[in-house]
Amino acid sequence: MDNSKDDLICIGFEGTAEKSGVGIITSKGEVLFNKTIIYTPPVQGIHPREAADHHAETFVKLLKEALNEVPLEKIDLVSFSLGPGLGPSLRVTATTARALSLSINKPIIGVNHCIGHVEIGKLTTDAVDPLTLYVSGGNTQVLAYTGKKYRVIGETLDIAIGNCLDQFARHCNLPHPGGVYVEKFAKDGNKFIKLPYTVKGMDLSLSGLLTSAMKKYDSKERIEDVCYSLQETSFSMLTEITERALAHTNKAEVMLVGGVAANNRLKEMLKVMCEEQNVDFYVPEKQFCGDNGAMIAWLGILQYLNGKRMDLKDTKPISNYRSDMVEVNWIHDESKNLNDGNIKSRKIPKHLIGKGAEADISKGRYLEFESITKERVKKGYRILKLDELIRTRRTVKEARFLAAVKECGIHAPSIYDIDKENKKIIMGYIHGKIAKDEIEEGNIEFCKSLGETIGKMHGSGIVHNDLTTSNFIISKNPYIIDFGLGKYSDLIEDKAIDLIVLKKSIMSIHYDKFDLVWNKIIDGYKTYELAESVLECIKEVEKRARYL
């Protein structure tokens, strides 16, 4: 490559699943060509081998079209999607890129498909340091850049949202891709059907929701009403975990990317949530939402210009290539640390002492006691029936579990009053700092006591379901708060997922202290008699994660 050129040109090949994409882009961010062809199976469902055959045919056609726009001799770099994705599709894509690289004697770079979505979004919008919700057929993740990596703060624990919608559509004999038809039918729905709503901290589960929606359809509910209810429930869950991640990271921007980002209802929900949280919202234009070659080409340029090089022997596809496996070499501004003050962060209204994903927190007095009032405010993005159900249920649940853990000898705020109608809890004010702030200031000795507290809670058959460093107050002892998602369970896997949620929350903003903090927490947790079984289960749950 001629490194003296002012404007380098890269061609990118995207082929991780059923979409073949070729894009050409310059190092100044000018898109010269971008076209995607989707494989539509003759029968329902995508067969990996047939998708690979589709790539083999369409890459030739797309390449000819691309080179009619940009002569071959102007190409300086070849980029392709290294993963994650379907093995056969990835292999055809890599082979195509290698063949072109060898034939024109130009360097080649394999890139992460997921991060390609994020970077093309940043290029084509005004987003600088966003919290990103990435939603597609094979991926559902909440991502944030910190410490030279895009950290996975939240994700699906089973199936991706796009797959959920497609499977439901197939069950109803609707064509592929099913999400388009679900959105179309949902517009004519007028009856909300209660479906499972499963959020665990900043993670979510969609398999139970899918099964229930299928059963509702089979029971002769109108398809319009089932689609409406499926979409409202699943998208509310997606918006909620994004809002939870926003409250934990204090980012000032949210960006929506991926194929499901084309859904207008999801965009509307996220826009409303961002307005309520007073942060900026971005979504790329439609051609850059779904899988496309331009995003692969752009990420290839970013990596190459910042020193990334690849030999052909290093271009073997990685089907489980997670976003957080990539060392980010193209972002050099370390002011993206949350506490530096050199980049925008979410602002808390002055009349509040805290604003979480669910509630506004204000300080006052109850009789002669210092107190706080926690009000679960209405969420404009959720339909009224669902919003009322969730806020009422969680208000009551939180009060019950705060009382329950205190009976188990665990430190928690005292409940003074509950206003179920207005979704308010008045509780004792705890003098101290949240664990997140203590850790950021370098104080970590208390972390062992966090583990002991969690172990005692699990030993009492209580699972928090939203363990983050934002949900502990450090006073003379650690106080645990925010039990809106809590439940009783003796299942080892439920306790393992509780710790996984905490683990990801620590990695998302305390990455530079992660080993020290996590090891101390685990040391304390081992006082729980079933700790080893839970820790072993964590490994099993993390290994089986399919959607990357």
From Swiss-Prot:
One GO CC term of this entry? cytoplasm
- Can you name the source organism? Methanococcus maripaludis (strain DSM 14266 / JCM 13030 / NBRC 101832 / S2 / LL)
Q: Which cofactor does it need?
A: Fe(2+)
Q: What does this protein do?
A: Required for the formation of a threonylcarbamoyl group on adenosine at position 37 (t(6)A37) in tRNAs that read codons beginning with adenine. Is a component of the KEOPS complex that is probably involved in the transfer of the threonylcarbamoyl moiety of threonylcarbamoyl-AMP (TC-AMP) to the N6 group of A37. The Kae1 domain likely plays a direct catalytic role in this reaction. The Bud32 domain probably displays kinase activity that regulates Kae1 function.
Q: Which residues are listed for ATP binding in this entry?
A: I353, G354, K355, G356, A357, E358, A359, D360, I361, K374
Catalytic reactions on record: L-seryl-[protein] + ATP = O-phospho-L-seryl-[protein] + ADP + H(+); L-threonyl-[protein] + ATP = O-phospho-L-threonyl-[protein] + ADP + H(+); L-threonylcarbamoyladenylate + adenosine(37) in tRNA = N(6)-L-threonylcarbamoyladenosine(37) in tRNA + AMP + H(+)
Under which name does UniProt file this protein? Probable bifunctional tRNA threonylcarbamoyladenosine biosynthesis protein
SS bond partners = none
